[in-house]
């Protein structure tokens, strides 16, 4: 069974590209099995919350980090769980 890892993704996102483009740096902490899934989650998250197209997201860095270094409390709490009952 694969182990879930914690990734930090740094990107530059162009918001409102069609009218008045505004670039902004984004840092997102993600729990995923590999870098590809972490990147896909970022695209999905920014697309659904901010209506940003994939070609408006420029990835600067994807790095695996220890759970303790994650600044997002939700990510740290999810890492502590042994199992989830639905």
Swiss-Prot record:
Question: Single Gene Ontology BP term?
Answer: translation
Kindly give the Gene3D superfamilies that the UniProt entry links to this protein: 3.10.20.10
Q: Which cellular component terms (GO) are annotated to the entry?
A: ribonucleoprotein complex; ribosome
Q: Which UniProt keywords apply?
A: Ribonucleoprotein, Ribosomal protein, RNA-binding, rRNA-binding
Q: InterPro entries, alphabetically?
A: Ribosomal_eL20, Ribosomal_eL20_dom
Family indicated by similarity: Belongs to the eukaryotic ribosomal protein eL20 family.
Give the multimer and partner information. Answer: Part of the 50S ribosomal subunit. Binds 23S rRNA.
What is the official name of this protein in its record?
Answer: Large ribosomal subunit protein eL20
**Lineage, opening ranks:** Archaea, Thermoproteota, Thermoprotei, Sulfolobales, Sulfolobaceae
């Amino acid at each position: 069974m694969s182990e879930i890892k914690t990734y930090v993704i740094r990107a530059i996102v162009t918001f409102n590209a069609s009218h008045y483009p505004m670039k902004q740096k984004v840092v997102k902490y993600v729990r995923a099995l590999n870098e590809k899934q972490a990147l896909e989650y970022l695209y999905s998250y920014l697309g659904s919350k901010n209506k940003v197209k994939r070609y408006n997201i420029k990835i600067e860095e994807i790095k695996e980090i220890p759970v303790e270094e994650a600044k997002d409390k939700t990510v740290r709490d999810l890492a502590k769980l042994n199992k989830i009952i639905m």
